[in-house]
């Protein structure tokens, strides 16, 4: 699908024009104090190239973004104040923060912008219309967002982590303003097209995370494209149970056992399960780890990571791969005693990349794990900023925030 991109907008000229940018600044916070501390600024860093290009070209930049999932309107704990400060540091300039989304403060600040200024709106999800299922409500918010950049304004979609959402600042505003894919979104789509097009083989997929139900679509889609799919994380126990093995107190989706049995029967030559598990008697960082066979987890233990034998086996498989997609940790990597599986496979993927493989880390917890475990990001071909969006794309689903960018350009303005 052909879409207009940031280069097209810059070629048209943005000096003196208002440009609304939907960024993904949904970073994790460590709540040590009212404003919180950013523990992983990766998404902020990824948003900088598009914003810097617009600033340098003299645009009046208005940024919309969300943080967390506010339940009942504004929540001080989910204010974008720490994000504004961190973004300003990375851009090397002051970033204004509006105290509202499209209220009087946002309007006044937007009207007062000069060329090269950056205004960050307060958490877009503080306005319930952003995520409304009612088309009219979302469109009403989108019109107010468009008003912030005026009749000559433009919209740049650069929040790949939200393009699978049909939301006011992602989808509806693009129906009102001339729309362009930002640098990040364009790069993400190009990478995912490589995973679904003429992929170099062998093609290995590594899937972790807690629930089979979250990954069912991508397993079914990629099982016909990949040469092997490694299953780890909490969801591996439902697959082990489907083989008739005891999984002790491990996470188990009982309602998915039959589905896993069907997948194992259908894709017996593709799916790869752990041969051993690192287990403990409780879910805690100080729990004593025990390595047990994957087909005989004791009743009083729960699996919290894949074992060293599994890491060795999967490392050998990955060492021969030419293309690798990884989404989801292999265990509870936040607990050091149960991080070896995730770290081992991450290192194996990085080693394969060093030998010429094309590797993609599919965002979310996988990207956080890479950073938390101290593995250089340069060891991978691409680290995505959007876990859910990546998975839905690979499932073959339409992404509303991408689909709308392929539509004919409106004339601009909020009308």
UniProtKB/Swiss-Prot annotation:
What Pfam families does this protein map onto? PGK (PF00162)
Which keywords does this chain's UniProt record carry? ATP-binding, Cytoplasm, Glycolysis, Kinase, Nucleotide-binding, Transferase
Its EC top class is transferase
Query: Could you give a single Gene Ontology term from the biological process aspect?
Result: gluconeogenesis
**Which Gene Ontology terms cover its molecular function?**
ADP binding; ATP binding; phosphoglycerate kinase activity
Q: Where in the cell is it found?
A: Cytoplasm
**GO cellular component, as recorded:** cytosol
Family to which this protein belongs: Belongs to the phosphoglycerate kinase family.
Provide the protein name.
Phosphoglycerate kinase
Task: Give the organism the record lists.
Answer: Mycobacterium avium (strain 104)
